[in-house]
């Protein structure tokens, strides 16, 4: 179906092989514009005899006739997922299908985002482009966070943007010991929290905390402290295979682990989180030439010198 071959690298690359037979939909449940797009997607799929599937919790967004599945079964056999909402909805969709390596098309039904590919009025053209194989798949580095309590692994969390250890609002400072790669102790951080971000996540919480914007084509991990109470307050940029080990120190209050904006668990003193590059890349569908820096310019209302001084 699509053209191109070879091993994809970071950035827009070759299309996946095979025809489009089964499509999944992830819909922002509280946004009427996303529900309207869901009905549009359902009509398109029915007209082309494409099997459409949604999550059981979002069945009403696409109509009662659309088959639904629980999260564990949702990605099985899918050729594509369409996320209807904003960047948060797209991150949720990617999290559902990350291990299955299903590409995701993000449709923006909210504010300008860095990840969604098309605006709401561009959905019909984008769906036709995907049907005809006129699209590419962009690979993004992901994160895998291994959580240990009492030296025993209790969970592994996958993230596209970031993994955050953060104190509760009323608690005193988070105290976290950091090791980098296979080396010894690097530093003890006293801060509101610590962010480990992918290049994709560099425009999210890490940026708000003072971190740099990093090209999504770069393989890297970013370590950014949140409001640090120490002289060293800069972001570290690491090779993704080096990894970061975060230990909640005994004198620290319990911290909250947040994965792609979702609070997933409380971490008591002594808990350890080891973050490395994920085994699976996030796969984003692109129907137009990706221009990351145009998005940065638009998001932050940047202008060239002539516009600023004129």
Q: Can you describe what each PLM-predicted range is?
A:
Residues 2-80, 84, 121-136, 147-157:
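ATP/NTP phosphate-donor binding region
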Residues 28, 82, 86, 108, ...:
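A residue-level signal for conserved active-site and pocket-lining positions in enzyme catalytic cores
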Residues 30, 87-89, 112, 200-202:
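Short glycine-rich anion-binding loops that position phosphate/pyrophosphate groups of nucleotides
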Residues 34-35, 88-93, 203-208:
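Short glycine/serine/threonine-rich phosphate/pyrophosphate-binding segments
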Residues 100-118:
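Short, acidic/small-residue loops that bind anionic groups at enzyme active sites
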Residues 112-193:
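Catalytic core of DAGKc-family lipid kinases
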Residues 165, 170, 181-182, 232-310:
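ATP/nucleoside-binding phosphotransfer catalytic cores, i.e., glycine-rich phosphate-binding loops
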Residues 173, 187-232:
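Gly/Ser/Thr-rich active-site loops/lids in small-molecule metabolic enzymes
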């Amino acid at each position: 179906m699509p053209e191109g071959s070879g091993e994809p690298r970071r950035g827009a690359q070759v299309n996946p092989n095979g025809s489009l037979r089964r499509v999944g939909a992830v819909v922002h449940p509280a946004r009427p514009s996303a529900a309207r797009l869901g009905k549009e997607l359902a009509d398109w799929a029915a007209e082309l005899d494409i099997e459409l599937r949604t999550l059981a919790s979002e069945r009403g967004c696409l109509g009662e006739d659309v088959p639904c599945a629980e999260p564990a079964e949702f990605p099985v056999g899918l050729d594509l997922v369409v996320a209807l909402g904003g960047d948060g909805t797209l991150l949720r969709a990617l999290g559902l299908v990350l291990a299955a390596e299903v590409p995701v098309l993000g449709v923006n039904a909210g504010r300008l985002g860095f990840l969604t590919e098309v605006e709401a009025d561009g959905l019909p053209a984008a769906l036709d482009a995907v049907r005809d194989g006129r699209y590419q798949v962009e690979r993004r580095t992901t994160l895998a966070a291994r959580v240990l309590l009492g030296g025993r692994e209790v969970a592994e969390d996958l993230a596209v943007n970031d993994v955050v250890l953060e104190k509760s609002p009323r608690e005193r400072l988070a105290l976290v010991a950091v090791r980098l790669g296979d080396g010894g102790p690097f530093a003890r951080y006293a801060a509101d929290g610590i962010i480990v971000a992918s290049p994709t996540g560099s425009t999210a919480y890490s940026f708000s905390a003072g971190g740099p914007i990093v090209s999504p084509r770069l393989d890297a991990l970013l370590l950014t402290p949140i409001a640090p109470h120490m002289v060293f307050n800069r972001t570290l940029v690491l090779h993704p295979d080096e990894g970061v080990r975060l230990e909640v120190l005994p004198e620290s209050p319990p911290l909250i682990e947040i994965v792609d904006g979702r609070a997933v668990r409380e971490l008591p003193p002594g808990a350890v989180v080891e973050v490395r590059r994920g085994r699976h890349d996030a796969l984003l569908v692109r129907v137009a030439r990706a221009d990351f820096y145009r998005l940065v310019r638009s998001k932050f209302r940047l202008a060239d010198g002539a516009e600023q001084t004129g």
